[in-house]
């Protein structure tokens, strides 16, 4: 196939889609480029074998190559390894809008691989990868009801920004990624700084409108390639069997969905499913048990959806707008820094906040460069939370995605590092789940952080919205259950403060979501969020004024840059000595900011005291308790401050000209001295403050000039006695 190229004006950028030159043995391959960022996206699908599957085996792998930015990977092997969290999240970003566009009952294996080959740091590759995946699918011949487009939308000074650069994004109050077909929005992922519902809705509509030009160009590319799609027909529905299942099971299934307890309801539905399969196989042993089970599921879906659309109570008895009962317990765990048990209906999370110092920040080494993450949020979904057995270990894609959504919801309200210098780690342990566990994590995180004494700018709550739509009839549901998510048409999660939205995630399974439906969903989400915030504020309205007794303390000091070397010492000896003697963790940066970290308040105060002494300057007219550090023929050097000595002249020590300094003072002896002066060369002249009067008189009467050398005459000796030599500096 000859090389085919499409150039698309996309905001301030030019998007280029190319096929026919690279990866020609894949069913579909597109090189998507934008201002120096290039992503190769390939699609391969199996033409048969789907009959043996009862699910759709779609796999999306997004991978970043370090050579794309001219870097060599770190680590022992010096090659790319397991996917980073960012790669996993972008894989999900590609997967979510395209998965609903494959036909029902299409179970053939499909694999999409997106590889970043070249990276301009100012142009994010995620949008390019999403568009490339859409184009590759459209030319692959796989049954696909696309194409889709994708766009990133920012918001600054009342203006929406299309595909902002990284620099522009840093100044934006919104980071919204949207994907959809020319007729409908399918997926939204966003982080915002407390923006209103109207601004968020406007951003979605703006992004959807802007991507239509991309969709049109992909359609043209597919026509130019001209690959014919193989005949694929969905299996014919056995209407007789469907009617028979309805006759056998409908009444019992309707009754089962009146059981409000999830586990009891699931147990009863499982029994009914097995009874139905057994009864129908007894009537006709040629029937397929899996087909019967799938049709039984369709019956469940029909019953639940029609009941809601008819205005009847939902599965757990609520109306469309009511939030499930909520209970909150802060200080749930005794020795953690902050904790919360958040329960909403049959969804429950133990959320724990831990405070650390700068050394605990997570180092992220990706192709965009190394960075440090001061706020980590880890979401765990153990199998017992849904009454099942399963593997426990590394987080799965879903856990990484849910954790990132909850993290995004809190980013807008975190205190600045100079106001609260702690590194924060949140762990959310989902102990029960029946829908919206990510939003329970948002609520629990806000409470756990405030319980730990973190001064959040405002509390944050989240709620998951659902949709049931048949023709022109629809119902928007607040705080959906797991079954309502599974059997419904939309999962729309909204988190925010009383002031506005901080995070929004939407996945839609159908086309035709109107502006009216979106407006209704946002309005109900605000109502639900406000209610949840009220319950949370009744439990803990503001952050605790004192940190937990088990939490470490951080003190920050600022010193002049020319004092950094003094604190560190030769080969780090001084700072190591401070750390060993006090047990305090000490970090100092190039600007002179020192961070002291310890669970022991007394140790912190001691470390501060020692550092202040290290950088303190000797002042004329002040009295110091010094220690004799060195005795010389013409006097004694007295250590006043760490690394700083002064000279106590022999005339201030000895009463007679025949007396030696060693007869009066010994090294290590402590005496009180007065700083009489400091000359231009920085030499410190001392007087012995508590020298006996008799000795003082005798010294005054003695011909000092004939017996002792003056300070000026001993300048070389004085300089040689300084504690910090030029070599040490």
From Swiss-Prot:
Protein name: Polyribonucleotide nucleotidyltransferase
Cellular compartments per GO CC: cytosol
Ligand binding (Mg(2+)): 485, 491
Organism: Legionella pneumophila (strain Lens)
Reaction(s) catalysed by this chain's protein: RNA(n+1) + phosphate = RNA(n) + a ribonucleoside 5'-diphosphate
Quaternary structure annotation from Swiss-Prot or TrEMBL: Component of the RNA degradosome, which is a multiprotein complex involved in RNA processing and mRNA degradation.
Domain S1 motif per the UniProt entry, residue ranges: 621-689
HAMAP family per the UniProt record, alphabetical: PNPase (MF_01595)
């Amino acid at each position: 196939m000859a090389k085919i190229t499409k150039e698309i004006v996309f905001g301030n950028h030019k998007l280029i889609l190319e096929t026919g030159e690279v990866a020609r043995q894949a069913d579909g391959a597109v090189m998507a480029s934008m201002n120096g960022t290039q992503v190769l996206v390939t699609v391969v699908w199996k033409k048969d074998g789907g009959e043996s599957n009862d699910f759709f085996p779609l796999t999306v792998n997004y991978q970043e190559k370090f050579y794309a930015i001219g870097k060599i990977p770190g680590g022992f092997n010096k090659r790319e390894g397991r996917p980073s969290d960012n790669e996993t999240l972008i894989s999900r970003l590609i997967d979510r809008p395209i998965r609903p566009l494959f036909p029902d009952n299409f179970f053939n294996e499909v694999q999409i691989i997106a590889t970043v080959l070249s990276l301009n740091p100012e142009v994010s590759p995620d949008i390019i990868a999403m568009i490339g995946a859409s184009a590759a699918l459209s030319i692959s011949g796989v049954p696909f009801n696309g194409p889709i487009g994708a766009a990133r939308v920012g918001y600054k000074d009342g203006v929406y920004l299309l595909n902002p650069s990284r620099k522009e994004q840093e100044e934006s109050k919104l980071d919204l990624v949207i994907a959809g077909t020319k007729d409908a929005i399918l997926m939204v992922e966003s982080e915002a700084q407390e923006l209103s519902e109207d601004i968020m809705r406007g951003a979605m509509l703006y992004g959807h409108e802007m991507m239509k030009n991309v969709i049109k160009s992909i359609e043209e590319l597919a026509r130019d390639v001209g690959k014919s799609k193989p005949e694929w027909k969905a299996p014919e529905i056995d209407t007789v069997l469907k009617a028979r299942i309805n006759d056998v099971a409908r009444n019992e299934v309707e009754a089962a969905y009146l059981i409000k307890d999830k586990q009891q309801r699931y147990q009863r539905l499982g029994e009914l499913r097995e009874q139905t399969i057994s009864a129908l196989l007894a009537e006709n042993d040629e029937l397929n048990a899996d087909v019967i089970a799938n049709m039984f599921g369709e019956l469940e879906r029909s019953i639940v959806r029609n009941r809601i659309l008819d205005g009847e109570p939902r599965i757990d008895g609520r109306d469309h707008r009511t939030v499930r009962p909520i209970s909150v317990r802060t200080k749930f765990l005794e020795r953690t820094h902050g904790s919360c048990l958040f329960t909403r209906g049959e969804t429950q999370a133990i959320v724990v906040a831990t405070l650390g110092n700068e050394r605990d920040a997570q180092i992220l080494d990706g192709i965009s460069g190394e960075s440090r993450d001061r706020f980590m949020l880890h979401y765990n979904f153990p199998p017992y939370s849904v009454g099942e057995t399963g593997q426990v270990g590394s987080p799965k894609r879903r856990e990484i995605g849910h954790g990132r959504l909850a993290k995004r919801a809190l980013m807008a309200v975190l205190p600045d590092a100079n106001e609260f210098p702690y590194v924060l780690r949140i762990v959310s342990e989902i102990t029960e789940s029946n829908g919206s566990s990510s939003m329970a994590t948002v609520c629990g995180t806000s409470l756990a952080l405030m319980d730990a004494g973190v001064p959040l700018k405002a509390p944050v709550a989240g709620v998951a919205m659902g949709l049931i739509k048949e023709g022109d009839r629809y119902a928007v549901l607040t705080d959906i259950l797991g079954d309502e998510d599974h059997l419904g048409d939309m999962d729309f999660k909204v988190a925010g403060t009383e002031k506005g939205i901080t995070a929004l995630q939407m996945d839609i399974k159908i086309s035709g979501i109107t502006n009216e439906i979106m407006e209704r969903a946002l309005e109900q989400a605000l109502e639900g969020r406000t209610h949840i915030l009220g319950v949370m504020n009744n439990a803990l309205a503001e952050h605790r004024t004192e940190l937990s007794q088990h939490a470490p303390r951080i003190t920050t000091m600022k010193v002049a840059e020319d004092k950094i070397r003094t604190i560190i010492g030769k080969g780090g000896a001084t700072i190591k000595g401070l750390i060993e003697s006090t047990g305090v963790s000490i970090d100092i940066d190039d600007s002179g900011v020192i961070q002291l970290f310890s669970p022991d308040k007394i140790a912190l105060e001691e470390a501060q005291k020692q550092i202040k002494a290290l950088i303190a300057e000797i002042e004329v007219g002040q009295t110091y308790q010094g220690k004799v550090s060195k005795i010389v023929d013409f006097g004694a050097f007295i250590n006043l401050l760490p690394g700083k000595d002064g000279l106590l002249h022999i005339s201030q020590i000895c009463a007679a000209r025949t007396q030696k300094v060693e007869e009066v003072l010994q090294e290590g002896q402590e005496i009180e001295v007065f700083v009489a002066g400091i000359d231009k060369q920085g030499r410190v002249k001392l007087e012995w403050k508590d020298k006996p009067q008799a000795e003082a008189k005798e010294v005054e009467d003695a011909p000092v000039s004939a017996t002792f050398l003056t300070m000026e005459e001993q300048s070389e000796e004085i300089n040689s006695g300084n504690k910090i030599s030029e070599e040490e500096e």
